[in-house]
């Protein structure tokens, strides 16, 4: 194998592919990137058997070939090279990287030890804009559970409906549901559970543009193609909880709250609240919302802001972090908070935007 390309481009490609490498594996091949020559580019692939990422780098190919190289080592070497052309050559299991007066030889692995990415057909696929998918991920992924003993809840449910795509995440204390209108041509609309890690890495690849992301789904795998990068992930097996039954359909109180001011005050109150299970107490009286937090070891916090209220006064407590997570990504000037009783779940929605619902369980006030 002999090729040359921009050091910057090759380093960037290795950085992208390396995101599929979760950590130090006992099998060196799972810590490696497969480099393959093709007509006018290098194809870089990393795959840890759960998540795989493949991208290409423009290159001049002199001699075709392939070799698996340690991802971290190759990235560290390239990051220290000057920003000029790098020559790549391989013989047997050694890969040589030469840039100006620097010359490094790294020990690689046989390419036939590298497991290829799963082949996922496009017969069950759809397209969505990068900006729309990025917002959907950011507005749901934070609600997924981090408890690995409940594997199903560590993922994000992807639901395909009538001209609609929906993402759902829950850790049982809160639920985030985000939908978007998308033309769907496939008749197979079975829901699937995408691992949080895959969604997190995908969100790093997509941009806030109208360019498309192509999503293809198989029985146990899902594929995303964006900006010339392919991300493949294994799906989580199992039955996702019936999330629709926990979304209240009625309310007795409705608050209209300015998002930025509310977020600022919750963040400030959380400085004290984090010493008392992150509890902040919301009290509604007339058109004033007060926030209080108290810790015997730290002190007290008090905030107030003007709101628009429908219904009677109420006192209810929430986890401050769970409020902050939603308010940080809602993206509108105001939110609606729909309430019934102090120990019943609350529903929060953006003002002036359809398709986003956040359900939050309250905490005991005392």
Residue ranges and their predicted role:
Residues 1-366:
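Structural preference for solvent-exposed beta-strand-turn elements
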């Amino acid at each position: 194998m002999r090729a040359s390309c921009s050091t910057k481009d090759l380093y960037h490609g290795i950085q992208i592919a390396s995101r599929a490498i979760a950590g130090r594996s006992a099998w060196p091949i799972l810590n490696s990137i497969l480099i393959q020559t093709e007509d006018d580019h290098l194809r870089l692939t990393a795959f840890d058997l759960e998540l795989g990422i493949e991208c290409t780098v423009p290159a001049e190919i002199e001699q075709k070939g392939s070799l698996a190289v340690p991802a971290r080592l190759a990235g560290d070497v390239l990051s220290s090279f000057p920003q000029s052309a790098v020559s790549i050559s391989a013989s047997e299991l050694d890969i040589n990287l030469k840039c100006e007066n620097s010359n490094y030889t790294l020990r690689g692995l046989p390419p036939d030890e590298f497991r290829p990415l799963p082949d996922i057909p496009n017969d069950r696929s759809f397209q969505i804009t990068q900006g729309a998918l990025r917002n959907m991920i950011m507005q749901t992924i934070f609600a997924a559970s981090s408890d690995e003993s409940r594997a199903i809840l560590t993922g994000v449910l992807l639901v395909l409906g009538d001209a609609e795509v929906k993402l759902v995440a829950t850790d049982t204390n809160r639920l985030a549901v985000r939908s978007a209108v998308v033309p769907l041509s496939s008749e197979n609309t079975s829901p699937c559970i995408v691992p949080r890690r895959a969604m997190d890495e995908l969100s790093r690849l997509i941009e806030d543009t109208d360019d498309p992301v192509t999503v293809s789904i198989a029985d146990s795998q899902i594929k995303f193609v964006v900006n010339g990068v392919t991300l493949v992930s294994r799906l989580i097996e199992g039955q996702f909880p019936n999330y629709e039954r926990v979304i209240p359909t009625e309310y007795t109180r409705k608050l209209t709250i300015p998002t930025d001011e509310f977020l600022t005050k919750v963040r400030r109150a959380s400085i004290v609240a984090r010493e008392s299970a992150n509890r902040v107490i919301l009290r509604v009286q007339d058109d004033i919302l007060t926030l209080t937090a108290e810790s015997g070891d730290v002190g007290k916090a008090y905030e107030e802001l003007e709101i628009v209220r429908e219904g009677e006064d109420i006192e209810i407590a929430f986890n401050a972090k769970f409020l902050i997570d939603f308010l940080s990504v809602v993206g509108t000037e105001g939110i609606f908070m729909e309430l019934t009783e102090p120990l019943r779940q609350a529903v929060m929605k953006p003002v002036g935007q359809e398709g986003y619902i956040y359900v939050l369980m309250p905490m005991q006030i005392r």
